[in-house]
From Swiss-Prot:
Protein name in UniProt: Elongation factor P
GO BP terms, alphabetized: peptide biosynthetic process
Subcellular location: Cytoplasm
CDD domains referenced in this protein's UniProt entry, alphabetically: S1_EF-P_repeat_1, S1_EF-P_repeat_2
GO MF annotations, alphabetized: translation elongation factor activity
């Protein structure tokens, strides 16, 4: 059991027979009245999100999540196929299940897939990925007074803001948690 007072981002719990993951939370202690935990959470089966205030002493059973490292193979219209590295079984996932992770995955990259009751529900890309810049504007000479950035499209289609010295064809390191440029490779 987990109490609402122990909610943190990424904590999973079961409420009314449905599994949820905490997306965001805020402990609130008003001047008058009892403290509460304002929580934004997502249903792991349907993908829908809700916001609700809980009493910190409210208790919920934990949702047991299984994780597997899998390899991203390819996408076919609306489905993204991942292969289990141990059994070689292919698992198709929808765009809702892969969410923003697909912006940072190239074919044959590894990712962590989370399962609840044998059903995949979330993809976590590696924390840092190396991607090739395929389109960006050339840097303007002399435009270095401050940390100037420009938009760059990488090979997966994601847009990353990079310093002006990064050019097309460069390979850059990106933090997938924030989508920020880290360095040139």
């Amino acid at each position: 059991m987990i109490s609402a007072g122990d909610f943190r981002k990424g904590v999973t719990f079961v409420m009314d027979g449905h599994p949820y993951v905490v997306i965001d939370f805020q402990h609130v202690k008003p001047g008058k009245g009892a403290a509460f935990v304002r929580t934004k959470y997502k249903n792991l089966k349907t993908g829908s999100t809700r916001e609700e205030a809980f009493n910190p002493s409210d208790k919920f059973p934990r949702a047991h999540i299984e994780t597997k490292e899998m390899q991203y193979l390819y996408n076919d219209s609306d489905l993204y196929y991942f292969m289990d590295n141990e059994t070689y079984e292919q698992v198709p996932l929808t765009l809702v299940e892969v969410e923003d992770a697909i912006k940072y995955l190239k074919e044959n990259d590894s990712a962590i897939i989370k399962f609840y009751e044998g059903r995949p529900f979330q993809v976590e890309p590696p924390i840092f990925v190396e991607l090739k810049v395929i389109e960006t504007e050339p840097g303007v000479k002399g435009d270095t007074a401050t940390n100037v950035t420009k938009a760059a499209t990488v090979e997966t289609g994601a847009i990353v803001y990079v310093p002006v010295f990064v050019n097309e064809g460069n390979i850059i390191k990106v933090d997938t948690r924030t989508g920020e440029y880290m360095s040139r490779v």
